[in-house]
A protein has these predicted regions:
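Extended acidic low-complexity intrinsically disordered regions
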Residues: 1-13
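A structural detector for beta-sheet-dominated domains
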Residues: 4, 18-20, 30-32
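Short acidic-hydrophobic surface loop/beta-edge motif
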Residues: 12-24
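Short, surface-exposed, charged amphipathic helix/loop patches that serve as local interaction elements
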Residues: 25-157
Length: 157
């Protein structure tokens, strides 16, 4: 498929973060947006609240403590899934994260900190993942301006 004569698969999709280390050292993180969440949905089904009977009939008990706990864990794994799978182009050799084990994904930040990254640097890595997976107004505006100017300049910062 082409859009305006361009095959979307040929456009760059990798975003890069370079964290300096001393005068000459650097850590390079690369992230790409995830195309879908099918693998996540298969490995981590969304929790369902228990039902309760009220005077109005049967309704979901969204205040159930077990449901809230399950939902919190689910949302943490979902965020961690975005992080570890978006960072695949970085070729990170995780210490405790196993890509096939959803319960370990939440260790991404622990592993990065154990490797020497600060809280701020971990925040920048998370921002990189967010940037790779979001189509924000700034990106759309830049693309519009480049299109209207008739240029084809890479959209990355």
């Amino acid at each position: 498929m082409k859009i305006g004569g361009i095959d979307p698969a040929t456009l760059p999709t990798v975003f890069t973060l370079v964290i300096p280390r001393g005068d000459t050292g650097r850590l390079v993180f690369q992230a790409t947006g995830l195309k879908d969440m099918e693998k996540f949905k298969k490995l981590c089904p969304e929790p369902v609240p228990p039902m309760m009977t009220t005077k109005d009939g049967t309704v979901a008990d969204i205040k159930d403590e077990n449901y809230i706990s399950d939902l919190t864990g689910y949302l943490k794994r979902r965020t961690a899934y975005y992080v570890v799978f978006s960072l695949e182009p970085s070729n990170i050799e995780w210490d405790t994260v196993d890509l096939e084990s959803p319960g370990t994904w939440i260790n991404w930040e622990v592993d990065l900190k154990k490797a020497g990254l600060s809280d701020v640097e971990c925040g920048r890595v998370l921002s990189l993942v967010t940037e790779a997976n979001c189509l924000d107004e700034a990106k759309l505006q830049r693309a519009r301006l480049l299109f209207l100017a008739g240029t084809q300049v890479p959209l990355q910062k």
